[in-house]
Amino acid sequence: MKTAHEVRPGNVIMFEGSPWVVQKTETTRSGRNAAIVKLKLKNLLLNSGTETTFKGEDKIDDIILDRLDCTYSYFADPMYVFMDAEYNQYDVEAENLGDAAAYIVDGMEETCQVTFYDGKAISVEMPTTIVREVIYTEPSARGDTSGKVMKPATITGGGTISVADFVKVGDKIEIDTRTGEFKKRV
Amino acid sequence: MSTSSNASHWDIFCTVVDNYGDIGVTWRLAKQLVNEYHIPIILWVDDLNSFSHILPTLNPKLVSQCFNGVIINHWTTPLAVPYLPGKVLIEAFACELPDEVKLQLATLHKTAPQAVPLWLNLEYLSAEDWVDGCHGLPSMQVSGIKKYFYFPGFTPKTGGLICERELFAERDAWQQDPANKLQLFESLGLKDIQAQDSVFSIFSYETDSLPALCELWQARAKNDAKIHALLPKGRSLNSLQHLLPCPVDALMPGQQIKLGDLTLHILPMTDQQGFDRLLWSCDVNIVRGEDSFLRAQWAAKPFIWHIYPQEDDYHLIKLEAFIRLYCDNLAPDIADTWSKLNFAFSQGQQSAVKTHWQNLNPVSLPLLQHAKEWPIDAINAADLATRLVQFVKKS
């Protein structure tokens, strides 16, 4: 069991006898600091999609599937190809990467976890923390250094995340892949 | 009194966290569902003492009683009154249902799935964009039952806002005759308030903003009409302790504290109808939380929202989201000042609160006109109870 807070893209959860791969998680704050977690899911048996919402502390029945540490090799549209330590290659559908696709870049060295269901690679879980370079963001608007004023930034790989106002083009930043949040400049 | 089995009834479970907010919302909803839709409602509340402050005739010692057609059960652990599944089950504001209720639902799901009530989580009100995308989504529970998230909100894609059918008509009738407000003040034991005086109600959390405003009102009142600030015993007064002749606990309803031409009045507790009328009768209302915040909007009067503080100042994001909606049709200069006043108040910025209050002149005609038009825009053709009933029908 996991709490909804702990679920992250790439996890597989069980509901009504079917396994669902988590493609996207979105955590927002409700009143009195309570969290709401919205999940985008894909049914691994029926290939259908759905969206669902949980309270942050709700328990979710996750299933442990076979996993392998792999590194990203290349993109062969529409498949991302990963490779394990023994040079076996695994294709993962781009759609199944969900939010993780925004963090995939050529030459990345981070080790990802590829999850298998019925012998087929179905999803990829990124490391909790990654470092990416900011390739575009507007200059600081207000000179705020508190870190609370946020602005959009495009990172290597093409994804867009909210970063602190003081972050500049060329800065390397740490990102929490579970939430897509900017952590700090490194 | 015991709860009878009635498959058509709805259960609403509410835990009282901050005295009058959660119970205020659920009590209004329960009454409206009974009055306007004739739905039998059982309201389960864990703190009847707090509830009795807004429903003075409630007996906190009884496990079950009935008011306004709503059966009110004391939510004890374990439950003193057995839970009998109805048509709908609402857990209000992310409260955790009693174990025996969850167990019954799980058992029903296995043995008679058609008898499982529609399970809803009624969430907090927010004007943030993400609410549109989360409203009405099912939540897959481990038991196999789907629970639906129901989000109140300001757009057509949300669950709407609590507003009784006749509320606006009653308010308009009340506000048309100035004698009504003077009679109300008198009935509340508030003395020496004249028709031309400025009257502000204050129902906030503790904040440095209040002493700043009082200082401003004291100075300003010397040249203008008298100013009266109406405050219930509670958190607002904690911020004004240095202006009071005795500890807050020793203050009596109806007591006046004169500070030059500013008079602080201690309000008695009142029921929800009385609170609505108070908001209708004041020139500006300072409110907090969710229930009073919404009722201040329905009052069609200028207001300041002292939003419930959250970690990492997340409440300021919620405040900004509401301000964006509220100011959509407001003249830019007024919108800017009203926005700054609200932010400054919620952050306890004394100097800024005074500056923006003076710049805004909250009793000015354009802001008042906007306050009158806003409720019609905000309600978006259907209130929360109406949309809730439609949601249940479709589910």
Swiss-Prot record, chain A:
Keywords: Cytoplasm, Elongation factor, Glycoprotein, Protein biosynthesis. Glycosylated ar Arg-32 by EarP: arginine rhamnosylation is required for EF-P function and rescue of polyproline stalled ribosomes. Glycans are attached at R32. Pathway: Protein biosynthesis; polypeptide chain elongation. NCBIfam families: efp, PRK00529.1. HAMAP family: EF_P. This is Elongation factor P. It comes from Shewanella oneidensis (strain ATCC 700550 / JCM 31522 / CIP 106686 / LMG 19005 / NCIMB 14063 / MR-1).
From Swiss-Prot, chain B:
DTDP-beta-L-rhamnose binds at N19, Y20, G21, D22, Y205, Q272, R288, G289, E290, D291, S292. This is Protein-arginine rhamnosyltransferase. It comes from Shewanella oneidensis (strain ATCC 700550 / JCM 31522 / CIP 106686 / LMG 19005 / NCIMB 14063 / MR-1). Disulfide bonds: none annotated. It is an enzyme of class 2 (transferase). Adopts a GT-B fold and acts as an inverting enzyme that converts the beta-configuration in the dTDP-beta-L-rhamnose donor to the alpha configuration in the N-linked (Rha) arginine product. It catalyses: dTDP-beta-L-rhamnose + L-arginyl-[protein] = N(omega)-(alpha-L-rhamnosyl)-L-arginyl-[protein] + dTDP + H(+). Its EC number is 2.4.1.-. Protein-arginine rhamnosyltransferase that catalyzes the transfer of a single rhamnose to elongation factor P (EF-P) on 'Lys-32', a modification required for EF-P-dependent rescue of polyproline stalled ribosomes. InterPro entries: EarP. The gene is earP. It comes from the Bacteria. Pfam families: EarP. Belongs to the glycosyltransferase 104 family. GO terms for molecular function: protein-arginine rhamnosyltransferase activity. The active site is at D22 (proton acceptor), E290. Keywords: Glycosyltransferase, Transferase. The lineage of its organism: Bacteria, Pseudomonadati, Pseudomonadota, Gammaproteobacteria, Alteromonadales.
